[in-house]
Amino acid sequence: MDFATTTEQRDLADAARRHLSERFPPSRLAATADHGLLDPEDWAALDRQGWLDADLGPVDLALLAEESGRALLPQPWVGTAGSALPVYQSAGLPLPGPAALVDSSDTCAAHDTPDWRISGSAPGVVDAHLATELVVAATTRQGVALFGVAPSEISIAERDDIDPLRRYATVRLLHAPARLLADPGRTAELLPALRLRSAMLLACEAVGVADGALAEAVRYAGTRTQFGQPIGSFQAVAHQLAEAYAEIETARSLAYRAAVTLNGDGAAEAVACAAVAGPRAAVLACEVALQVCGGIAMTWEFGLHLRYRRALWLDAHRVTSVPPHDVLAALLLS
């Protein structure tokens, strides 16, 4: 299996890194975390940069997800690109803007001629409060179908969570008007693919979070001196950084493998491996960075806490109700 990226893919990742570092400096991330204000122009800029192009393949998306994690991108791109964009592409419709998938078994749809109406609830929809339209998986008489619902037609209760840059919301629908995006037959193919795609992108995002934390720790270890020399020269520090590096490289290889195999045989196993390794590497790298950076890492201004919060969020988040460890165990033991 060839994991080597093409020149075009490397250029895409480099351009994404430059764009995000210029647009989202630490001071802006801190302000967004404190006040929760997002600039719609940021989403438009991502669109102009090609982050939502229909011709992006899984590897392209994986590289963008990694860069979004490195920069802690405070826009709902991962959720939109992972679990909503393919629905609109399949339906031949333009993406209306940021979108969130409501993947719940507690929603049902009835055909109230000429419209569809949806009722039900979902307790943990990521970035639902930022969506211009929600893609709702709802049960019909013929099976589960996918619908588009305007946020103005439903109740969205945002809730505080460990990561102030990515929040859950409880979504409640009561006879909400909806438009059909995918019938039950198409949905039966789309939903499993959406879940795999979303899990793959989150694993790649976790690699970016981890790599960003390690870079901060290495930079600090090279400039902070103790006993007349950089603290990075001490084995107690160097060994921790090396351990984090090894964990990140393993997670990166598994994430790229998941991207390469996403549309082929073995995708479920590859994605499960990446979903286990990515968040684990992110948590470890952030905890190592906190230890290496010492007291300054505990300050709100330093910003490392935002990386750690995202790592913990990624480690706790589940694309489906089945944890990836259980998915992997079932696949290996079957």
Predicted regions and their residues:
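Alpha-helical interface subdomain recognition
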Residues: 1-71, 196-334
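FAD-binding core of flavoproteins
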Residues: 75-78, 82, 86, 91-215
